[in-house]
């Protein structure tokens, strides 16, 4: 499974984004890392970063995204505004696993003020190893979720 992964953060998640970006670039499962910001001296509000990342997935230009803000909540809420995107905030192994295997979530969000860096790095490594099975019992539930999205023209 070769993945194109988008990374993004606001200023409250910049340090973790940079560390995770380095880990992703060194991981053989990742073929491309796309950084949508912020830069070291930038101050872009998290909704803009999260939506930019989610749109790349929705447009087929990336497979997954890893987003960081202070809590991980704002980036998840923002990314979920993009049709077809399922973003979660998860700070434990079981939730990370189930986010992919049960919910086919493409976006994993962390809170830099909530979870330690080493745990975030470990969870990101684990997350890369999970792949949704479209023939699983969960597939019908994911389709039901998608059915609640407004039709796009």
From Swiss-Prot:
Active site, UniProt feature: 69 (proton acceptor)
Membrane keyword on record: no
UniProt cross-references to SUPFAM superfamilies, sorted A to Z: Ribose/Galactose isomerase RpiB/AlsB
Assigned keywords, A-Z: Carbohydrate metabolism, Isomerase
Highest taxon of the lineage: Bacteria
UniProt record, GO biological process: carbohydrate catabolic process; carbohydrate utilization; cellular response to carbohydrate stimulus
Catalysed transformations (reactions): D-erythrulose 4-phosphate = D-erythrose 4-phosphate
Entry-linked InterPro entries: Rib-5-P_Isoase_Actino (IPR011860), RpiB_LacA_LacB (IPR003500), RpiB_LacA_LacB_sf (IPR036569), SPI_LacAB/RpiB (IPR051812)
Upregulation: Up-regulated during growth on erythritol, D-threitol or L-threitol relative to growth on glycerol.
Pathway(s) it belongs to: Carbohydrate metabolism; erythritol degradation; Carbohydrate metabolism; D-threitol degradation
Phenotype seen when the gene is deleted: Cells lacking both derI1 and derI2 are totally unable to grow on D-threitol or on erythritol.
Entry keyword annotation includes Ribonucleoprotein: no
Sequence similarity: Belongs to the LacAB/RpiB family.
Function: Catalyzes the isomerization of D-erythrulose-4P to D-erythrose-4P. Involved in the degradation pathways of erythritol and D-threitol, that allow M.smegmatis to grow on these compounds as the sole carbon source.
Protein name: D-erythrulose-4-phosphate isomerase 1
Organism whose genome encodes this protein: Mycolicibacterium smegmatis (strain ATCC 700084 / mc(2)155)
